[in-house]
Design a protein with these regions (language model features):
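Short, solvent-exposed loop/edge-beta patches enriched in aromatic
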Residues: 11, 38-41, 163-168, 258-263
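Short Pro-Gly-centered flexible turn/kink motifs
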Residues: 43-45, 161-179
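Hydrophobic alpha-helical scaffolding
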Residues: 90, 149, 164, 194, ...
Length: 263
């Protein structure tokens, strides 16, 4: 997980962002954003969520960008968007795609966004600049236009909010990948409050702490012992450790080398 905090004294706002992948059957990443008024005056602002979607695996990074986007099919819903490209292709041929990519968001009361910008073109404008999108800098609302075959964007605009001094507001973003169609309303119902996010966060911490203790070694070198705890939560490397049990000579040699390295 990752927790990040930023404060802008000139603007008068502080943001705290928690990102993690919760333990459970859902292939999702949660992002909880808490905005606090740290000034001595009322502050009004319009919150946006903006998650660019490539909607392909890393294997497709070097595919023809325009052709890739032409295969994109976007579905706009109450809480966000779902993207399901029609085909996957490379030099060996074409095959149907079954993977769905999605972004959904809500405030801490479970209310969805007022407006959704389903493509980068609609959100960024003609410049295509993700760092200065026209939707934000020129206060543009999304226009009804053809969205299929375009580069997708999980961008959403919430209603204007005014925070008194010391007050805060929270937004939850759910991002995911699935091999079947996902119900965004159900996901928001499951994760769409800070109390629920915090419960899943504590469960996630507990799970990984237990995983890190599955292999407990006291070598006399704290750096080496901590490194082994880290290795313990790496699925591929953990499989390697199980193989080493059948080859103790290799295990002892590696331990000796690493022990010497961490002295």
């Amino acid at each position: 997980w990752q927790r990040m905090s930023r404060k802008n004294k000139k603007v008068g706002l502080k943001s705290e962002i928690l990102s993690f992948i919760p333990i459970g059957p859902d292939a999702v990443e949660l992002m909880q954003v808490v905005i606090t008024n740290v000034s001595n005056r009322k502050i009004s602002f319009i919150p946006y969520v903006a998650i660019p979607l490539y909607a392909r695996s890393a294997d497709n990074l070097r595919d023809h960008r325009h052709v890739t986007s032409l295969l994109t099919r976007i579905k706009e819903e109450k809480y966000g968007i779902k993207v399901k490209p029609t085909l996957l292709f490379n030099e060996s041929g074409h095959r149907p795609n079954n993977t769905v990519y999605y972004v959904a968001a809500c405030d801490n009361q479970g209310r969805g966004p007022q407006y959704i910008y389903p493509t980068q073109e609609i959100f960024c404008g003609e410049s295509g600049d993700l760092e200065a999108p026209e939707a934000v800098f020129e206060n543009k609302l999304p226009q009804k236009t053809f969205i299929q075959g375009k580069e997708p964007m999980g961008a959403m605009r919430f209603g204007k909010i005014t925070l008194p001094p010391g007050a805060q507001t929270t937004y939850i973003i759910v991002m995911g990948i699935s091999q079947k169609d996902s119900n965004l309303s159900s996901l928001i119902n499951k994760f769409g409050k800070s109390t629920k996010v915090n419960v899943y966060f504590e469960k996630t911490i507990s799970f990984w702490q237990k995983q890190a203790k599955l292999l407990d070694i006291s070598s006399g070198n704290d750096h080496f012992d901590n490194w082994l705890r880290w290795v313990n939560i790496q699925p591929v490397l953990f499989t390697g450790f199980r193989l080493w049990k059948r080859r103790p000579g290799l295990a002892r040699s590696l331990a000796g080398l690493l022990g010497a390295y961490f002295k």
